[in-house]
Amino acid sequence: MFCFQCQETAKNTGCTVKGMCGKPEETANLQDLLIFVLRGIAIYGEKLKELGQPDRSNDDFVLQGLFATITNANWDDARFEAMISEGLARRDKLRNAFLAVYKAKNGKDFSEPLPEAATWTGDSTAFAEKAKSVGILATENEDVRSLRELLIIGLKGVAAYAEHAAVLGFRKTEIDEFMLEALASTTKDLSVDEMVALVMKAGGMAVTTMALLDEANTTTYGNPEITQVNIGVGKNPGILISGHDLKDMAELLKQTEGTGVDVYTHGEMLPANYYPAFKKYPHFVGNYGGSWWQQNPEFESFNGPILLTTNCLVPLKKENTYLDRLYTTGVVGYEGAKHIADRPAGGAKDFSALIAQAKKCPPPVEIETGSIVGGFAHHQVLALADKVVEAVKSGAIKRFVVMAGCDGRQKSRSYYTEVAENLPKDTVILTAGCAKYRYNKLNLGDIGGIPRVLDAGQCNDSYSLAVIALKLKEVFGLDDINDLPVSYDIAWYEQKAVAVLLALLFLGVKGIRLGPTLPAFLSPNVAKVLVENFNIKPIGTVQDDIAAMMAGK
Protein backbone atom coordinates (compact mmCIF):
# COMPACT_ATOMS: atom_id res chain seq x y z
CA MET A 1 0.00 0.00 0.00
CA PHE A 2 0.94 3.63 -0.30
CA CYS A 3 -1.32 6.32 1.15
CA PHE A 4 -0.49 9.91 2.05
CA GLN A 5 -3.87 11.60 1.90
CA CYS A 6 -4.19 12.58 5.59
CA GLN A 7 -2.14 14.80 7.89
CA GLU A 8 -1.08 11.93 10.16
CA THR A 9 0.56 9.86 7.41
CA ALA A 10 3.68 8.01 8.58
CA LYS A 11 6.79 10.23 8.89
CA ASN A 12 4.88 12.80 6.83
CA THR A 13 5.82 10.84 3.72
CA GLY A 14 3.27 8.00 3.39
CA CYS A 15 1.86 4.87 5.00
CA THR A 16 3.25 1.68 3.45
CA VAL A 17 2.43 -1.16 5.84
CA LYS A 18 -0.72 -0.06 7.64
CA GLY A 19 -2.42 3.31 7.76
CA MET A 20 -1.79 5.52 10.79
CA CYS A 21 -5.59 5.73 10.75
CA GLY A 22 -5.68 1.96 11.28
CA LYS A 23 -6.52 1.12 7.66
CA PRO A 24 -5.12 -2.30 6.65
CA GLU A 25 -3.13 -2.70 3.44
CA GLU A 26 -5.97 -4.63 1.77
CA THR A 27 -8.48 -1.83 2.39
CA ALA A 28 -6.09 0.87 1.21
CA ASN A 29 -5.44 -1.01 -2.02
CA LEU A 30 -9.16 -1.58 -2.66
CA GLN A 31 -9.69 2.17 -2.27
CA ASP A 32 -7.02 2.75 -4.93
CA LEU A 33 -8.77 0.30 -7.24
CA LEU A 34 -12.11 2.04 -6.71
CA ILE A 35 -10.56 5.37 -7.72
CA PHE A 36 -9.07 3.61 -10.78
CA VAL A 37 -12.55 2.34 -11.75
CA LEU A 38 -14.07 5.81 -11.22
CA ARG A 39 -11.45 7.16 -13.64
CA GLY A 40 -12.71 4.65 -16.21
CA ILE A 41 -16.29 5.85 -15.75
CA ALA A 42 -15.08 9.44 -16.10
CA ILE A 43 -13.24 8.73 -19.35
CA TYR A 44 -16.41 7.51 -21.08
CA GLY A 45 -18.52 10.18 -19.39
CA GLU A 46 -16.23 12.86 -20.81
CA LYS A 47 -16.29 11.30 -24.29
CA LEU A 48 -20.10 11.15 -24.32
CA LYS A 49 -20.24 14.81 -23.29
CA GLU A 50 -17.86 15.68 -26.16
CA LEU A 51 -20.28 13.93 -28.53
CA GLY A 52 -23.17 16.03 -27.19
CA GLN A 53 -24.75 13.07 -25.36
CA PRO A 54 -23.89 13.59 -21.66
CA ASP A 55 -24.90 10.74 -19.35
CA ARG A 56 -25.92 11.67 -15.79
CA SER A 57 -26.76 8.16 -14.57
CA ASN A 58 -23.49 7.72 -12.65
CA ASP A 59 -23.32 11.06 -10.84
CA ASP A 60 -24.41 9.73 -7.44
CA PHE A 61 -22.17 6.68 -7.73
CA VAL A 62 -19.12 8.84 -8.47
CA LEU A 63 -19.81 11.14 -5.50
CA GLN A 64 -20.36 8.22 -3.15
CA GLY A 65 -17.33 6.34 -4.45
CA LEU A 66 -15.03 9.30 -3.83
CA PHE A 67 -16.65 9.96 -0.44
CA ALA A 68 -16.18 6.33 0.67
CA THR A 69 -12.40 6.66 0.28
CA ILE A 70 -12.12 9.64 2.64
CA THR A 71 -10.07 8.99 5.77
CA ASN A 72 -12.02 7.22 8.54
CA ALA A 73 -15.17 6.68 6.46
CA ASN A 74 -15.35 3.07 5.30
CA TRP A 75 -13.36 0.17 6.72
CA ASP A 76 -15.39 -2.64 5.15
CA ASP A 77 -13.57 -4.51 2.35
CA ALA A 78 -16.77 -6.26 1.26
CA ARG A 79 -18.41 -2.88 0.66
CA PHE A 80 -15.44 -1.73 -1.43
CA GLU A 81 -15.46 -4.93 -3.47
CA ALA A 82 -19.17 -4.46 -4.15
CA MET A 83 -18.59 -0.84 -5.23
CA ILE A 84 -15.74 -1.87 -7.54
CA SER A 85 -17.91 -4.57 -9.15
CA GLU A 86 -20.77 -2.12 -9.59
CA GLY A 87 -18.36 0.49 -10.93
CA LEU A 88 -17.01 -1.88 -13.57
CA ALA A 89 -20.56 -2.75 -14.66
CA ARG A 90 -21.46 0.95 -14.85
CA ARG A 91 -18.29 1.73 -16.79
CA ASP A 92 -18.96 -1.04 -19.32
CA LYS A 93 -22.55 0.10 -19.81
CA LEU A 94 -21.25 3.63 -20.39
CA ARG A 95 -18.62 2.31 -22.81
CA ASN A 96 -21.28 0.54 -24.86
CA ALA A 97 -23.35 3.73 -24.95
CA PHE A 98 -20.30 5.72 -26.07
CA LEU A 99 -19.35 3.22 -28.79
CA ALA A 100 -22.89 3.27 -30.17
CA VAL A 101 -23.11 7.08 -30.18
CA TYR A 102 -19.63 7.37 -31.74
CA LYS A 103 -20.52 4.96 -34.55
CA ALA A 104 -23.83 6.72 -35.22
CA LYS A 105 -22.08 10.10 -35.42
CA ASN A 106 -18.97 9.05 -37.34
CA GLY A 107 -20.16 6.12 -39.43
CA LYS A 108 -17.32 3.92 -38.17
CA ASP A 109 -16.24 2.09 -35.02
CA PHE A 110 -14.14 3.87 -32.39
CA SER A 111 -10.54 2.61 -32.66
CA GLU A 112 -8.35 5.04 -30.69
CA PRO A 113 -6.23 3.79 -27.75
CA LEU A 114 -7.71 4.24 -24.27
CA PRO A 115 -6.16 4.34 -20.78
CA GLU A 116 -6.20 1.07 -18.87
CA ALA A 117 -8.81 2.45 -16.45
CA ALA A 118 -11.25 2.37 -19.36
CA THR A 119 -10.47 -1.18 -20.45
CA TRP A 120 -9.33 -3.39 -17.55
CA THR A 121 -11.81 -5.95 -16.37
CA GLY A 122 -11.80 -8.69 -13.76
CA ASP A 123 -13.94 -10.30 -11.09
CA SER A 124 -13.52 -9.93 -7.32
CA THR A 125 -10.85 -12.64 -7.23
CA ALA A 126 -8.61 -10.37 -9.33
CA PHE A 127 -9.18 -7.17 -7.33
CA ALA A 128 -6.48 -7.61 -4.68
CA GLU A 129 -3.72 -8.26 -7.20
CA LYS A 130 -4.81 -5.54 -9.64
CA ALA A 131 -5.10 -3.01 -6.82
CA LYS A 132 -1.36 -3.27 -6.16
CA SER A 133 -0.50 -1.86 -9.59
CA VAL A 134 -2.93 1.07 -9.85
CA GLY A 135 -2.10 3.06 -6.71
CA ILE A 136 -0.53 6.46 -6.26
CA LEU A 137 3.02 5.29 -7.06
CA ALA A 138 1.90 4.10 -10.51
CA THR A 139 2.60 7.72 -11.54
CA GLU A 140 6.40 7.88 -11.60
CA ASN A 141 7.06 11.61 -11.98
CA GLU A 142 6.96 13.10 -8.48
CA ASP A 143 5.51 16.47 -9.49
CA VAL A 144 2.88 15.00 -11.82
CA ARG A 145 1.93 12.58 -9.04
CA SER A 146 1.72 15.43 -6.55
CA LEU A 147 -0.55 17.57 -8.73
CA ARG A 148 -2.78 14.63 -9.65
CA GLU A 149 -3.15 13.62 -6.01
CA LEU A 150 -3.73 17.20 -4.86
CA LEU A 151 -6.57 17.28 -7.39
CA ILE A 152 -8.02 13.87 -6.42
CA ILE A 153 -7.73 14.58 -2.69
CA GLY A 154 -9.45 17.95 -3.08
CA LEU A 155 -12.03 16.26 -5.31
CA LYS A 156 -12.87 13.80 -2.52
CA GLY A 157 -13.71 16.73 -0.24
CA VAL A 158 -15.85 18.41 -2.89
CA ALA A 159 -17.63 15.09 -3.53
CA ALA A 160 -18.48 14.74 0.16
CA TYR A 161 -20.09 18.19 0.22
CA ALA A 162 -21.88 17.59 -3.09
CA GLU A 163 -23.27 14.29 -1.79
CA HIS A 164 -24.69 15.99 1.33
CA ALA A 165 -26.37 18.60 -0.85
CA ALA A 166 -27.71 15.93 -3.23
CA VAL A 167 -29.27 14.01 -0.32
CA LEU A 168 -31.31 17.16 0.39
CA GLY A 169 -32.32 17.46 -3.28
CA PHE A 170 -29.82 20.17 -4.27
CA ARG A 171 -27.33 19.62 -7.07
CA LYS A 172 -25.63 21.48 -9.90
CA THR A 173 -24.69 19.84 -13.18
CA GLU A 174 -21.43 21.80 -13.29
CA ILE A 175 -20.24 20.03 -10.11
CA ASP A 176 -21.00 16.57 -11.48
CA GLU A 177 -19.38 17.46 -14.80
CA PHE A 178 -16.24 18.63 -13.02
CA MET A 179 -16.02 15.33 -11.14
CA LEU A 180 -15.69 13.54 -14.48
CA GLU A 181 -13.38 16.15 -15.99
CA ALA A 182 -11.02 16.02 -13.01
CA LEU A 183 -10.97 12.23 -12.71
CA ALA A 184 -10.41 11.77 -16.44
CA SER A 185 -7.65 14.40 -16.45
CA THR A 186 -5.51 12.22 -14.19
CA THR A 187 -5.24 9.65 -17.01
CA LYS A 188 -3.89 12.23 -19.48
CA ASP A 189 -0.39 13.61 -20.10
CA LEU A 190 -1.06 17.24 -19.23
CA SER A 191 1.39 20.10 -18.79
CA VAL A 192 2.13 21.39 -15.30
CA ASP A 193 0.23 24.60 -16.12
CA GLU A 194 -2.82 22.59 -17.20
CA MET A 195 -2.73 20.54 -14.00
CA VAL A 196 -2.34 23.63 -11.81
CA ALA A 197 -5.31 25.19 -13.62
CA LEU A 198 -7.41 22.11 -12.81
CA VAL A 199 -6.40 22.31 -9.14
CA MET A 200 -7.51 25.95 -9.06
CA LYS A 201 -10.72 25.00 -10.84
CA ALA A 202 -11.27 22.45 -8.06
CA GLY A 203 -10.97 25.33 -5.60
CA GLY A 204 -13.65 27.23 -7.49
CA MET A 205 -15.83 24.14 -7.53
CA ALA A 206 -15.30 23.76 -3.77
CA VAL A 207 -16.69 27.29 -3.31
CA THR A 208 -19.66 26.49 -5.56
CA THR A 209 -20.33 23.22 -3.74
CA MET A 210 -20.05 24.68 -0.24
CA ALA A 211 -22.42 27.46 -1.29
CA LEU A 212 -24.85 24.85 -2.60
CA LEU A 213 -24.65 22.83 0.62
CA ASP A 214 -25.15 25.99 2.66
CA GLU A 215 -28.27 26.70 0.60
CA ALA A 216 -29.46 23.10 1.03
CA ASN A 217 -28.95 23.06 4.80
CA THR A 218 -30.41 26.50 5.50
CA THR A 219 -33.37 26.14 3.12
CA THR A 220 -34.25 22.82 4.72
CA TYR A 221 -33.48 23.45 8.39
CA GLY A 222 -33.31 27.24 8.77
CA ASN A 223 -30.33 29.53 9.36
CA PRO A 224 -28.09 28.60 12.30
CA GLU A 225 -28.57 30.96 15.23
CA ILE A 226 -26.67 31.79 18.40
CA THR A 227 -27.16 28.79 20.66
CA GLN A 228 -26.04 27.66 24.10
CA VAL A 229 -25.40 23.92 23.71
CA ASN A 230 -25.66 21.67 26.75
CA ILE A 231 -22.62 19.39 27.17
CA GLY A 232 -24.00 17.50 30.15
CA VAL A 233 -26.37 14.52 30.14
CA GLY A 234 -29.98 13.73 30.97
CA LYS A 235 -31.51 10.82 32.84
CA ASN A 236 -32.94 8.91 29.85
CA PRO A 237 -31.14 6.42 27.62
CA GLY A 238 -29.76 8.06 24.50
CA ILE A 239 -28.61 7.67 20.91
CA LEU A 240 -25.36 9.38 19.89
CA ILE A 241 -25.15 10.64 16.30
CA SER A 242 -21.83 11.58 14.73
CA GLY A 243 -20.71 12.70 11.28
CA HIS A 244 -22.15 15.44 9.07
CA ASP A 245 -25.46 14.27 7.55
CA LEU A 246 -28.25 16.60 8.72
CA LYS A 247 -30.98 14.60 6.96
CA ASP A 248 -30.07 11.56 9.04
CA MET A 249 -30.24 13.84 12.09
CA ALA A 250 -33.70 15.10 11.13
CA GLU A 251 -35.08 11.60 10.58
CA LEU A 252 -33.57 10.27 13.81
CA LEU A 253 -35.08 13.11 15.86
CA LYS A 254 -38.49 12.55 14.32
CA GLN A 255 -38.42 8.78 14.88
CA THR A 256 -37.23 9.08 18.50
CA GLU A 257 -39.92 11.63 19.42
CA GLY A 258 -42.05 10.37 22.30
CA THR A 259 -40.03 7.16 22.75
CA GLY A 260 -38.28 8.14 25.97
CA VAL A 261 -34.94 8.02 24.13
CA ASP A 262 -32.82 11.17 24.04
CA VAL A 263 -30.55 12.24 21.17
CA TYR A 264 -27.03 13.67 21.52
CA THR A 265 -24.62 14.93 18.89
CA HIS A 266 -20.94 14.05 18.74
CA GLY A 267 -17.98 15.51 16.87
CA GLU A 268 -18.92 17.26 13.64
CA MET A 269 -22.65 16.85 14.31
CA LEU A 270 -22.40 19.45 17.12
CA PRO A 271 -23.60 22.27 14.78
CA ALA A 272 -26.96 20.50 14.36
CA ASN A 273 -27.73 22.11 17.72
CA TYR A 274 -27.68 25.53 16.00
CA TYR A 275 -30.45 24.84 13.45
CA PRO A 276 -33.99 26.06 14.28
CA ALA A 277 -35.66 22.94 12.80
CA PHE A 278 -34.00 20.71 15.39
CA LYS A 279 -34.63 22.91 18.43
CA LYS A 280 -38.31 21.98 18.58
CA TYR A 281 -37.43 18.51 19.88
CA PRO A 282 -37.23 18.50 23.70
CA HIS A 283 -35.47 15.13 23.67
CA PHE A 284 -32.53 16.64 21.74
CA VAL A 285 -30.33 17.07 24.81
CA GLY A 286 -27.08 18.51 23.45
CA ASN A 287 -23.53 17.43 22.58
CA TYR A 288 -21.55 14.60 24.15
CA GLY A 289 -17.76 14.58 24.16
CA GLY A 290 -15.14 16.09 21.92
CA SER A 291 -13.70 15.60 18.46
CA TRP A 292 -13.44 12.40 16.43
CA TRP A 293 -10.16 11.04 17.76
CA GLN A 294 -11.45 10.89 21.34
CA GLN A 295 -14.36 8.63 20.42
CA ASN A 296 -13.15 5.30 21.81
CA PRO A 297 -13.61 6.18 25.51
CA GLU A 298 -16.56 8.48 24.75
CA PHE A 299 -18.51 5.88 22.77
CA GLU A 300 -17.76 3.42 25.57
CA SER A 301 -19.11 5.69 28.32
CA PHE A 302 -22.12 6.86 26.31
CA ASN A 303 -23.76 3.45 26.96
CA GLY A 304 -26.32 3.72 24.15
CA PRO A 305 -26.35 3.13 20.37
CA ILE A 306 -23.98 5.21 18.23
CA LEU A 307 -24.81 6.22 14.64
CA LEU A 308 -22.01 7.18 12.25
CA THR A 309 -23.49 9.10 9.32
CA THR A 310 -20.11 9.99 7.71
CA ASN A 311 -16.47 10.08 8.74
CA CYS A 312 -14.82 10.05 11.22
CA LEU A 313 -15.06 6.47 12.51
CA VAL A 314 -12.04 5.19 14.43
CA PRO A 315 -11.31 1.45 14.73
CA LEU A 316 -12.30 -0.04 18.06
CA LYS A 317 -9.57 -0.88 20.55
CA LYS A 318 -9.28 -4.31 22.19
CA GLU A 319 -10.86 -3.06 25.41
CA ASN A 320 -13.86 -1.49 23.65
CA THR A 321 -17.21 -3.23 24.06
CA TYR A 322 -19.51 -1.04 21.95
CA LEU A 323 -19.36 -2.84 18.58
CA ASP A 324 -22.80 -4.37 19.23
CA ARG A 325 -24.26 -0.86 19.55
CA LEU A 326 -22.34 0.72 16.67
CA TYR A 327 -24.38 1.54 13.55
CA THR A 328 -23.18 2.91 10.22
CA THR A 329 -25.14 4.43 7.35
CA GLY A 330 -24.48 6.10 3.99
CA VAL A 331 -20.90 5.64 2.79
CA VAL A 332 -19.67 4.56 6.24
CA GLY A 333 -18.82 0.91 6.80
CA TYR A 334 -17.19 -1.16 9.53
CA GLU A 335 -17.02 -4.93 9.74
CA GLY A 336 -19.21 -6.15 12.60
CA ALA A 337 -21.24 -2.94 12.87
CA LYS A 338 -24.89 -2.91 11.79
CA HIS A 339 -25.52 -0.93 8.61
CA ILE A 340 -28.70 1.13 8.20
CA ALA A 341 -29.86 0.89 4.58
CA ASP A 342 -30.37 3.92 2.37
CA ARG A 343 -33.81 5.51 2.43
CA PRO A 344 -36.31 4.30 -0.19
CA ALA A 345 -37.39 6.85 -2.78
CA GLY A 346 -39.60 9.39 -1.03
CA GLY A 347 -39.14 7.64 2.31
CA ALA A 348 -36.93 7.82 5.40
CA LYS A 349 -34.18 5.62 6.82
CA ASP A 350 -35.39 3.14 9.42
CA PHE A 351 -33.76 3.78 12.80
CA SER A 352 -36.11 1.50 14.76
CA ALA A 353 -33.28 -0.94 15.61
CA LEU A 354 -31.32 1.81 17.35
CA ILE A 355 -34.38 3.00 19.25
CA ALA A 356 -35.25 -0.52 20.42
CA GLN A 357 -31.69 -1.12 21.57
CA ALA A 358 -31.45 2.28 23.27
CA LYS A 359 -34.46 1.50 25.44
CA LYS A 360 -32.50 -1.39 26.96
CA CYS A 361 -29.38 0.70 27.67
CA PRO A 362 -28.48 2.77 30.74
CA PRO A 363 -28.25 6.57 30.35
CA PRO A 364 -24.93 8.10 29.28
CA VAL A 365 -22.18 8.55 31.86
CA GLU A 366 -21.63 12.24 32.51
CA ILE A 367 -18.13 13.26 31.38
CA GLU A 368 -18.52 17.05 31.62
CA THR A 369 -21.11 19.70 32.46
CA GLY A 370 -21.97 23.20 31.34
CA SER A 371 -22.52 24.61 27.87
CA ILE A 372 -20.74 25.97 24.83
CA VAL A 373 -21.94 28.64 22.42
CA GLY A 374 -22.10 28.43 18.63
CA GLY A 375 -24.26 29.20 15.63
CA PHE A 376 -22.24 32.02 14.08
CA ALA A 377 -22.73 31.15 10.42
CA HIS A 378 -22.80 34.00 7.91
CA HIS A 379 -26.51 34.84 8.29
CA GLN A 380 -26.15 35.26 12.06
CA VAL A 381 -22.87 37.17 11.92
CA LEU A 382 -24.14 39.50 9.19
CA ALA A 383 -27.17 40.19 11.39
CA LEU A 384 -24.60 41.47 13.91
CA ALA A 385 -22.61 43.26 11.20
CA ASP A 386 -23.16 46.78 12.57
CA LYS A 387 -21.89 45.70 15.98
CA VAL A 388 -18.87 43.91 14.49
CA VAL A 389 -17.97 46.79 12.14
CA GLU A 390 -18.26 49.31 14.97
CA ALA A 391 -15.99 47.16 17.16
CA VAL A 392 -13.39 47.08 14.38
CA LYS A 393 -13.65 50.82 13.73
CA SER A 394 -13.37 51.66 17.42
CA GLY A 395 -10.35 49.40 17.83
CA ALA A 396 -12.16 47.07 20.24
CA ILE A 397 -11.49 44.27 17.74
CA LYS A 398 -7.98 44.52 16.32
CA ARG A 399 -7.89 41.29 14.37
CA PHE A 400 -9.84 38.19 13.36
CA VAL A 401 -7.99 34.87 13.29
CA VAL A 402 -9.57 32.11 11.20
CA MET A 403 -8.76 28.84 12.97
CA ALA A 404 -11.02 26.53 10.98
CA GLY A 405 -10.31 22.96 9.94
CA CYS A 406 -9.78 19.61 11.58
CA ASP A 407 -8.64 18.22 14.88
CA GLY A 408 -6.36 15.19 15.18
CA ARG A 409 -4.38 12.98 17.52
CA GLN A 410 -0.91 14.47 17.30
CA LYS A 411 0.41 16.20 20.41
CA SER A 412 1.65 19.08 18.25
CA ARG A 413 -1.99 20.16 17.86
CA SER A 414 -1.80 21.64 21.35
CA TYR A 415 -0.38 24.57 19.35
CA TYR A 416 -3.94 25.57 18.43
CA THR A 417 -5.09 25.57 22.06
CA GLU A 418 -2.08 27.67 23.04
CA VAL A 419 -2.65 30.14 20.19
CA ALA A 420 -6.26 30.58 21.31
CA GLU A 421 -5.20 31.08 24.93
CA ASN A 422 -2.43 33.54 24.10
CA LEU A 423 -4.01 35.70 21.41
CA PRO A 424 -4.51 39.27 22.63
CA LYS A 425 -7.90 39.96 24.21
CA ASP A 426 -8.82 42.28 21.31
CA THR A 427 -8.88 39.41 18.79
CA VAL A 428 -11.78 37.21 17.67
CA ILE A 429 -11.37 33.61 16.52
CA LEU A 430 -13.53 32.52 13.56
CA THR A 431 -13.86 28.75 13.37
CA ALA A 432 -15.63 25.88 11.63
CA GLY A 433 -14.96 22.16 11.64
CA CYS A 434 -13.73 20.01 14.50
CA ALA A 435 -10.59 22.14 15.01
CA LYS A 436 -12.88 24.11 17.35
CA TYR A 437 -12.64 21.41 20.01
CA ARG A 438 -9.09 22.56 20.77
CA TYR A 439 -10.45 25.80 22.27
CA ASN A 440 -14.27 25.97 22.26
CA LYS A 441 -14.50 25.00 25.93
CA LEU A 442 -11.98 27.61 27.09
CA ASN A 443 -13.40 30.69 28.75
CA LEU A 444 -12.03 33.30 26.37
CA GLY A 445 -14.66 35.93 27.14
CA ASP A 446 -16.22 38.44 24.75
CA ILE A 447 -15.67 41.87 23.24
CA GLY A 448 -18.67 44.12 23.85
CA GLY A 449 -20.97 41.12 23.87
CA ILE A 450 -19.34 39.47 20.83
CA PRO A 451 -17.89 36.09 21.91
CA ARG A 452 -14.18 35.74 21.16
CA VAL A 453 -14.80 32.35 19.53
CA LEU A 454 -17.39 32.48 16.75
CA ASP A 455 -18.21 28.94 15.60
CA ALA A 456 -19.81 28.86 12.15
CA GLY A 457 -20.45 25.10 12.19
CA GLN A 458 -19.16 22.04 10.33
CA CYS A 459 -16.06 22.04 8.12
CA ASN A 460 -18.23 22.88 5.09
CA ASP A 461 -19.39 25.98 6.95
CA SER A 462 -15.93 27.41 6.29
CA TYR A 463 -17.96 28.83 3.41
CA SER A 464 -19.61 31.10 6.00
CA LEU A 465 -16.21 32.42 7.04
CA ALA A 466 -15.46 33.28 3.40
CA VAL A 467 -18.84 35.06 3.07
CA ILE A 468 -18.13 37.03 6.25
CA ALA A 469 -14.67 38.03 5.00
CA LEU A 470 -16.04 39.12 1.61
CA LYS A 471 -18.78 41.14 3.33
CA LEU A 472 -16.23 42.88 5.58
CA LYS A 473 -14.14 43.66 2.49
CA GLU A 474 -17.21 45.31 0.94
CA VAL A 475 -18.15 47.22 4.12
CA PHE A 476 -14.64 48.61 4.52
CA GLY A 477 -14.36 49.45 0.82
CA LEU A 478 -11.27 47.33 0.25
CA ASP A 479 -10.10 46.06 -3.13
CA ASP A 480 -8.23 43.02 -1.81
CA ILE A 481 -9.46 40.41 0.67
CA ASN A 482 -5.90 40.27 2.01
CA ASP A 483 -6.14 43.89 3.23
CA LEU A 484 -8.66 42.86 5.91
CA PRO A 485 -7.53 42.52 9.55
CA VAL A 486 -7.89 38.74 9.15
CA SER A 487 -5.23 36.06 9.56
CA TYR A 488 -5.60 32.37 8.67
CA ASP A 489 -4.16 29.68 10.95
CA ILE A 490 -5.74 26.53 9.52
CA ALA A 491 -5.51 23.01 10.93
CA TRP A 492 -5.99 20.18 8.47
CA TYR A 493 -6.41 16.43 8.77
CA GLU A 494 -8.46 14.94 5.94
CA GLN A 495 -9.58 15.62 2.40
CA LYS A 496 -12.45 18.02 3.06
CA ALA A 497 -9.94 20.38 4.65
CA VAL A 498 -7.95 20.23 1.41
CA ALA A 499 -11.09 21.24 -0.51
CA VAL A 500 -11.53 24.17 1.91
CA LEU A 501 -7.88 25.16 1.43
CA LEU A 502 -8.27 25.12 -2.37
CA ALA A 503 -11.45 27.20 -2.00
CA LEU A 504 -9.56 29.85 0.00
CA LEU A 505 -6.78 29.92 -2.59
CA PHE A 506 -9.35 30.29 -5.37
CA LEU A 507 -10.83 33.28 -3.49
CA GLY A 508 -7.38 34.87 -3.48
CA VAL A 509 -6.53 34.44 0.20
CA LYS A 510 -2.78 34.61 0.79
CA GLY A 511 -0.51 34.03 3.77
CA ILE A 512 -2.36 31.00 5.16
CA ARG A 513 -0.59 29.12 7.94
CA LEU A 514 -1.26 25.41 7.48
CA GLY A 515 -0.48 22.85 10.14
CA PRO A 516 0.45 21.01 12.15
CA THR A 517 2.47 19.83 9.10
CA LEU A 518 2.32 20.63 5.41
CA PRO A 519 0.73 17.83 3.33
CA ALA A 520 2.97 14.91 2.39
CA PHE A 521 1.37 14.81 -1.06
CA LEU A 522 2.97 18.15 -1.96
CA SER A 523 6.27 17.50 -3.72
CA PRO A 524 8.99 20.11 -3.03
CA ASN A 525 8.33 21.74 -6.41
CA VAL A 526 4.54 21.85 -5.98
CA ALA A 527 4.93 23.18 -2.43
CA LYS A 528 7.25 25.86 -3.86
CA VAL A 529 4.53 26.93 -6.33
CA LEU A 530 2.01 27.32 -3.48
CA VAL A 531 4.51 29.25 -1.36
CA GLU A 532 5.51 31.59 -4.20
CA ASN A 533 1.98 32.25 -5.47
CA PHE A 534 -0.02 32.17 -2.23
CA ASN A 535 2.55 32.58 0.55
CA ILE A 536 1.34 29.39 2.24
CA LYS A 537 3.51 28.74 5.28
CA PRO A 538 3.96 26.10 7.98
CA ILE A 539 3.18 26.90 11.59
CA GLY A 540 6.03 28.06 13.84
CA THR A 541 6.07 28.70 17.56
CA VAL A 542 2.95 30.02 19.25
CA GLN A 543 4.51 33.34 20.25
CA ASP A 544 6.21 33.96 16.90
CA ASP A 545 3.05 33.17 14.94
CA ILE A 546 0.86 35.37 17.13
CA ALA A 547 3.32 38.26 16.79
CA ALA A 548 3.41 37.82 13.01
CA MET A 549 -0.38 37.56 12.68
CA MET A 550 -0.93 40.67 14.80
CA ALA A 551 1.48 42.46 12.45
CA GLY A 552 -0.54 41.27 9.47
CA LYS A 553 2.10 38.76 8.36
From Swiss-Prot:
Binding-site positions, hybrid [4Fe-2O-2S] cluster: H244, E268, C312, C406, C434, C459, E494, K496
Origin: domain of life: Bacteria
Family note: Belongs to the HCP family.
Cofactor binding description: Binds 1 spin-admixed [4Fe-4S] cluster. Binds 1 hybrid [4Fe-2O-2S] cluster.
InterPro entries xref list: HCP/CODH, Hydroxylam_reduct, Prismane-like_a/b-sand, Prismane-like_sf, Prismane_a-bundle
Binding site for [4Fe-4S] cluster: C3, C6, C15, C21
Pfam family, one: Prismane
Protein name (database record): Hydroxylamine reductase
